[in-house]
Amino acid sequence: MNKRIVVTGTDTGVGKTVFSAGLAGLLGANYWKPVQAGLEQEIDSECIRRLGGLSSDRIVPELYRLRTPASPHHSAEIDGVRIDTETLGLPDSGERRLVIEGAGGLMVPLTARTLYIDIFERWQLPVVLCARTGLGTINHSLLSIEALRKRQIRILGIAFIGERNAETESAVCEIGRVRWLGRLPWLVPLTNDRLQAAFKDSFVSSDFLNL
């Protein structure tokens, strides 16, 4: 039985990491971000530990930790690092489920020749697409859905993040023919307790278990 889920987004800054923290907490899953670009501030795995309540042994180490906060291919070039995409194999998470977070959107380049979506196509894992609820998200979401379908990557569903926008959410799901998984509101302040409570109110765990 597959126990791995990929979390990707329509863009950078849509809330993938916060969603991943909530999902890992809800499922009792491990977390892995294959490539981390930017090390000066709180990195994504640290954010996951704080917001998801994960112990350090539930964080799978990154394969690449790049200093510069930029697209991985550019960050690697600046740091003098060569990303070998052949090493991006799936780790063993034991009996636990595994939440895998990409970087930015689907077309983010890892190298000059390899995009994140190329890796997702190779893995053939179910994908949760995170999207904004604001203006422009219909276009971004439908383009992302089309790209995933073209590669025959299974879309588990779409998770919206932001203020409620029923018309937009409905349009994306109906036109894109994808399942609405729920909507996570922006939380201020954003804490572990508030995120876990909001996640349980916004999503149904069984939607992420039958993979």
Swiss-Prot record:
ATP binds at G13, V14, G15, K16, T17, V18, E101, G102, A103, G104, P185, W186, L187, N192. Mg(2+) binds at T17, C47, E101. The keyword DNA damage does not apply. The keyword Nucleotide-binding applies. CDD domains: DTBS. One of its GO terms (cellular component) is cytosol. It catalyses: (7R,8S)-7,8-diammoniononanoate + CO2 + ATP = (4R,5S)-dethiobiotin + ADP + phosphate + 3 H(+). Its cofactor is Mg(2+). One of its GO terms (molecular function) is magnesium ion binding. InterPro entries: DTB_synth_BioD, P-loop_NTPase. It is an enzyme of class 6 (ligase). Pathway: Cofactor biosynthesis; biotin biosynthesis; biotin from 7,8-diaminononanoate: step 1/2. Keywords: ATP-binding, Biotin biosynthesis, Cytoplasm, Ligase, Magnesium, Metal-binding, Nucleotide-binding. It is found in: Cytoplasm. One of its GO terms (biological process) is biotin biosynthetic process. The active site is at K33. It holds the Pfam family AAA_26. Coiled coil: none annotated. Signal peptide: none annotated. Its main location: cytoplasm. Its EC number is 6.3.3.3. HAMAP family: BioD. Belongs to the dethiobiotin synthetase family. Homodimer. Catalyzes a mechanistically unusual reaction, the ATP-dependent insertion of CO2 between the N7 and N8 nitrogen atoms of 7,8-diaminopelargonic acid (DAPA, also called 7,8-diammoniononanoate) to form a ureido ring. This is ATP-dependent dethiobiotin synthetase BioD. It comes from Bradyrhizobium diazoefficiens (strain JCM 10833 / BCRC 13528 / IAM 13628 / NBRC 14792 / USDA 110).
